Amino acid sequence: MTAIGAQAHKLLGLKRPHRSFFESFIRTLIIVCTALAVVLSSVSICDGHWLLVEDHLFGLWYFCTIGNHSEPHCLRDLSQAHMPGLAVGMGLARSVAAMAVVAAIFGLEMLIVSQVCEDVRSRRKWAIGSYLLLVAFILSSGGLLTFIILLKNQINLLGFTLMFWCEFTASFLFFLNAASGLHINSLTQPWDPPAGTLAYRKRGYDGTSLI
């Protein structure tokens, strides 16, 4: 084998150092919990029925009146609930909550890509995914707070439905996974290819791309 061929073989065989089982387990757990949070939030928003007060069911999409022996009568036009600002406020709440799901999906994608395609940029991709989850937490919390503020006079702790608690749990998981992702990224050491390798030359001594 020629010297050039041997060097090329060495460069192709260069791999990232094997990470510990604990680190791999934690990163996998973060990805799984993030996927669970995305599912919970999506189902909660699509259903949208978050608060039951006596014979009234308040949601992101509908306002329903429940009779004693009749089917729920639901109105898509929330202005007919005779509550000032409810229609506009609910529109804002569901928009913010939906944006949280979108941010979380992109964050989840970055987390998965950083683990499947491991290279010198994996840590950066993981950090971006974690920050997107933090954005998802802020947006999701904003949607929950908007809903609570709009219906503060009707709120009863026992009146919150399962779908509301699903969204609350998803919001908490967004924060927990974002914080955990950033923390584990700060604990692990970045992978720098040995000097003289092709990957090192591409990055340059200051970390910038030369090719």
UniProtKB/Swiss-Prot annotation:
Record-annotated membrane-spanning stretches: 25-45, 96-116, 131-151, 155-175
Top-rank taxon, per record: Eukaryota
Main localization of the protein described in the UniProt heading: membrane
A Pfam family matched in the record: TMEM37
GO molecular function, one term: voltage-gated monoatomic ion channel activity
One GO location term (cellular component): monoatomic ion channel complex
Disulfide bonds: none
Keywords noted in UniProt: Calcium, Calcium channel, Calcium transport, Ion channel, Ion transport, Membrane, Transmembrane, Transmembrane helix, Transport, Voltage-gated channel
UniProt-annotated location(s): Membrane
Membrane topology annotation: Multi-pass membrane protein
Family to which this protein belongs: Belongs to the PMP-22/EMP/MP20 family. CACNG subfamily.
Function: Thought to stabilize the calcium channel in an inactivated (closed) state. Modulates calcium current when coexpressed with CACNA1G.
Self-association and partners: The L-type calcium channel is composed of five subunits: alpha-1, alpha-2/delta, beta and gamma.
The protein's name in its UniProt record: Voltage-dependent calcium channel gamma-like subunit
Organism: Mus musculus
